[in-house]
């Protein structure tokens, strides 16, 4: 009968490779758009270093075949991601990224391998490399804590995808069980931390997944609409009162010189103000109908403007004073 650790390791391989393959959709988008957009490149560089060191660790650990297969596959995928990012990154980003890749994935990795092979032997070599691998893995598992802080602050799981949290939980749990079966604490400690963080993320997801996002994006627009409506009501009321005063003056036989409508206080109120504006000719027509039974009429002592001259010449009456947007 096969060792249970082998079956657990196979399951861990499948889950881990799925996690490593998750950025494929991101890089398909990068290739199609020929741009790295706002995607970060540092996680792929650090993951490439981590998987490379774990592969080296598995090669020197007795019975470490499953460690080699999963991390070797991960290192190959991460190398492809780094290469694609370099191909489509902007010139400044590319120059900076090349320096980091050469320093971390070439220089640091080569230094660790050289020291381990030349200066360290047996159990000491395995211990030193195992500590480095565990430290890198803990750092990678701690990275999603920023997303957890964002969830708590915004009370929204928008920035913490469920699938990523679930696979973090599952991957950490499976490899923690594997570490107990093979008694490898360099694998167990970082994956136990990953399992705990994955559990915490799932708990946050369950707590905030039904929470509605606070209305914040449309707040400024709503305030502008309310302000515009208030100004519209105020302007309409003022124009109506002004017309009432004109009617009273006309009834008393006073001469009236109508001012031109004032420029609108708000761009969106142009049509509203136009609807309340009347020309002297229209007002005279209305008053003539109102006082049709009387034997007197009122004389306008106003100086005709361009519109009045046009009416007198052409026999038509403009409905409103044209604003800047209505002239052709």
Curated annotation (Swiss-Prot):
Q: Which UniProt keywords apply?
A: Cell membrane, Membrane, Repeat, Sugar transport, Transmembrane, Transmembrane helix, Transport
Question: Carries keyword Transferase?
Answer: no
What residue ranges are annotated as transmembrane? 6-26, 39-56, 64-84, 100-120, 126-146, 162-182, 186-206
- Those parts of the protein on the Extracellular side are 1-5, 57-63, 121-125, 183-185
Q: Name one Pfam family in it.
A: MtN3_slv
Q: What GO terms are given for molecular function? A: sugar transmembrane transporter activity
Kindly list the biological process annotations in GO that this record carries: carbohydrate transport
Q: Which residues form the MtN3/slv domain?
A: 6-92, 127-213
Q: Where is the composition biased (Basic residues)?
A: 288-299
The answer to whether UniProt assigns keyword Nucleotide-binding to this entry is no
Q: List where Low complexity composition bias occurs.
A: 312-328
Membrane topology listed for this record: Multi-pass membrane protein
Family to which this protein belongs: Belongs to the SWEET sugar transporter family.
Q: What does this protein do?
A: Mediates both low-affinity uptake and efflux of sugar across the plasma membrane.
Subunit structure, as described in the record: Forms homooligomers and/or heterooligomers.
| Name the record gives this protein | Bidirectional sugar transporter SWEET16
Organism, by scientific name, is Oryza sativa subsp. japonica
> Upper lineage ranks?
Eukaryota, Viridiplantae, Streptophyta, Embryophyta, Tracheophyta
- Gene that encodes it: SWEET16
